UniProtKB/Swiss-Prot annotation:
Keywords: Chromosome, Coiled coil, Differentiation, Metal-binding, Nucleus, Phosphoprotein, Spermatogenesis, Zinc, Zinc-finger. Residues 308-374 form the PWWP domain. A zinc finger (CW-type) spans 241-295. The keyword Nuclease does not apply. This is Zinc finger CW-type PWWP domain protein 1. Residues 449-459 have a biased composition (Acidic residues). One of its GO terms (molecular function) is zinc ion binding. The lineage of its organism: Eukaryota, Metazoa, Chordata, Craniata, Vertebrata. It is found in: Nucleus; Chromosome. SMART domains: PWWP. The modification Phosphoserine is found at S619.
Length: 630
């Protein structure tokens, strides 16, 4: 009894602490009926009076059980509160760590299976991980796990490949003893994923570039022509071919194995229905032979349809389809570019064009075609005749390049080899075109020709040189021969007069009119007189007889001053005398020296006028003396 009383007191204490708020709520609710009575003071009906009494009775009844049966209800509520965490703990304890790992691996395996199911070529050899793993049963809540699987399933093949690597690493290090897949199967799965990735990228590029989906035939062609070019860690050689390995996939649906092309083979020339039996390698020329092992990663693979040396047709804006060759850019060292770092399909190729002019450019993939695809008739439909001739030369060069191997093709018809060859060879076609179109080269040629002409003229004009000296002194031959012949200069005077008169075609003038003509000749005389007064010859001519001889020669009649001759003189009897050999040889010399005499006249303009007047007086006196002697 004492124990029961103690427990009863403890329950009362517990009820007081636990159920204090509900009692306060009940006390706070008591004014509500009074307020309800106050709101309706005018209601005197018996129903209105009985309702408050009923409320009071109900409140009293509620208070009694709380006091009388309070410990029992409090105990029940405590038990309920204790049962709830116990249930939660029981629920948490039901899922162990091993079970959690199993569920996690099952989810990953299901996502991997869904990725593998997308590729049809893997369905017949795909291993079922659930069958291989004994003791792992898929849970009954597959529908609940379906939503997370949809989220985990990758949208892009690249994420699927990374997820596959994580799953393989986890499966290799798992504690459940799961068997690790063989390397050949793993590589096959990787290739199937790469194939799926290529399909997705092909569709994406075609939609972006063409603005429409390609036809079914083109899609099949793209799937069949899976030429993967694996770029090695080493850099490309200067030739442009580089250290790359070319792989081609068999078109047979039962095989679809990747075969490595050895040797200088252009993959763009291969047919669409290429199979293993067309492989030149005898070790891998059948479909039943397993695929060659390859130790590489997916990031090193680029799905390129062309390699350095592939001959193609390229189209640029404003130009017709033009033959060219795929070659590495000499500046970048690459021959294709990607639109983004996530792509595995090149968006542009570097093309070196064939033809007389050496040129290169980056061309989009949609503007490239194989050399065998485009007909020559469509290409040659060009309105410009000049471009037609250049196009024919380019096509001929492409045919010559087609006859060589892919490695020799790059070395012989590459950009640098043709560009350097055009610079070195003087007879190169490219050099002749550049020189004909370049105005600077024409100016250089003209300048060289002018310099050569000036040098020749200077050689003729320069008195110090031995060669031009007789050419400049030819008009003074009679004067130089005077002192050598003898002291008397009269015979030489006559010969000089004869030689100059022989040049003139004007009939002899009467003697009476000679004075007037002499006056006119004296006015015009200083110009031809200066012509014969060269500085070098002045010093040499010291005799007075020679000076008289020169002055008399200047008086001889000539038709005009263009030949370096003097005005007409008054000598009517001279033409009746027979000319000598010296006189006959003199006119051509005078003709040759006419241009030189004009320049000499310009140099001697600065001589004083007084000297010219003194010479005019002396010449008039000598002329009279000569007339008296005759």
């Amino acid at each position: 009894m004492m124990a029961a009383l103690q427990t009863h007191k403890e329950y009362e204490k517990g009820t007081k602490k636990t159920f204090a708020p509900p009692t306060q709520k009940l006390h706070s609710e008591k004014p509500q009926p009074s307020s309800w009575k106050e709101d309706a003071p005018g209601t005197s009906s018996p129903e209105a009076e009985t309702k408050p009494s009923l409320l009071k009775a109900s409140l009293k009844k509620e208070q009694k059980p709380t006091t009388e049966h309070g410990p029992n209800r409090g105990q029940e509520r405590k038990l309920k509160a204790q049962d709830q965490p116990a249930k939660k703990k029981g629920k948490e304890r039901t899922l162990t760590s091993a079970e959690f790992e199993e569920i996690f691996q099952i989810v990953l395996q299901k996502s991997l299976q869904e990725c593998l199911e997308t590729s049809s070529c893997v369905q017949h050899i795909r291993p079922t991980k659930l069958d291989e793993e004994p003791g792992i049963v898929p849970p009954a809540t597959d529908k609940k796990d379906a939503d997370p699987e949809k989220v985990i399933t990758p949208d892009t093949p690249k994420i699927a490949s990374s997820l596959e690597e994580e799953v393989n690493s986890e499966m290799g290090t798992s504690k459940l003893g799961q068997p690790v897949t063989e390397p050949s199967k793993k590589k096959f799965n990787r290739l199937s994923l790469s194939k799926q990735k290529k399909k997705a990228e092909d569709e994406k590029m075609e939609k972006i570039q063409d603005g429409r989906e390609c036809s079914l035939k083109e899609k099949q062609k793209i799937v069949i022509q899976d030429q993967s070019q694996i770029r090695g860690p080493q850099k490309e050689e200067e030739s442009g071919f580089g250290h790359c390995v070319i792989w081609v996939q068999c078109s047979s649906p039962k095989c679809e194995k990747w075969r490595q092309l050895r040797g200088n083979i252009d993959p763009s020339v291969l047919p669409d229905d290429w199979s293993c039996d067309q492989n030149p390698d005898p070790n891998y020329n059948r479909c039943d032979i397993p695929e060659e092992s390859w130790a590489g990663c997916e990031s090193d693979v680029a799905y390129a349809s062309y390699v350095p040396g592939s001959i193609i047709w390229a189209k640029q804006y404003g130009y017709p389809w033009w033959p060219g060759m795929i070659e590495a850019d000499p500046d970048l060292g690459e021959y294709f570019l990607f639109a983004s770092h996530l792509d595995s399909l090149p968006s542009k190729y570097h093309v070196t064009f064939f033809g007389e002019t050496v040129s290169r450019a980056w061309i989009p993939v949609r503007m490239l075609k194989n050399f065998q695809e485009l007909s020559l008739e469509l290409v040659k439909k060009c309105k410009n005749k000049n471009s037609n001739q250049k196009l024919e030369a380019a096509i001929a060069m492409a045919h010559r390049a087609e006859q060589t191997s892919i490695q020799e093709r790059v070395n012989l018809f590459g950009f640098w080899s043709r560009y350097n060859g055009a610079d070195i060879s003087e007879e190169g076609e490219d050099l002749t075109l550049c020189e004909s179109n370049n105005p600077e080269s024409c100016l250089e040629k003209e300048e060289k020709d002018l310099e050569e002409e000036k040098e020749e003229e200077e050689e003729k004009k320069d008195p110090t040189l031995p060669r031009p000296k007789p050419a400049k002194m030819q008009t003074k031959k009679p004067k130089s021969r005077g002192p050598a012949g003898g002291p008397d200069g009269t015979p030489k005077k006559k010969t000089a007069k004869k030689s100059l008169v022989s040049e003139s075609t004007v009939p002899p003038v009467p003697t009476l009119g000679g004075k007037e003509e002499q006056g006119n000749s004296d006015l015009d005389h200083p110009v031809p007189k200066k012509k014969f007064k060269a500085p070098e010859n002045k010093t040499s001519a010291t005799n007075l007889s020679e000076e008289k001889e020169i002055k008399i020669v200047s008086k001889c009649p000539t038709p005009s001053a263009q030949h370096g001759a003097c005005p007409l003189g008054k000598e009517g009897l001279v033409p009746h005398m027979p000319p000598t050999q010296e006189a006959a040889s003199f006119p051509p010399d005078d003709d040759c020296s006419s241009d030189l005499d004009l320049e000499q006249l310009m140099e001697d303009i600065g001589e004083p006028e007084e000297r010219g007047e003194m010479q005019q007086r002396g010449s008039s006196e000598e002329f009279l003396a000569a007339l008296f002697e005759e």
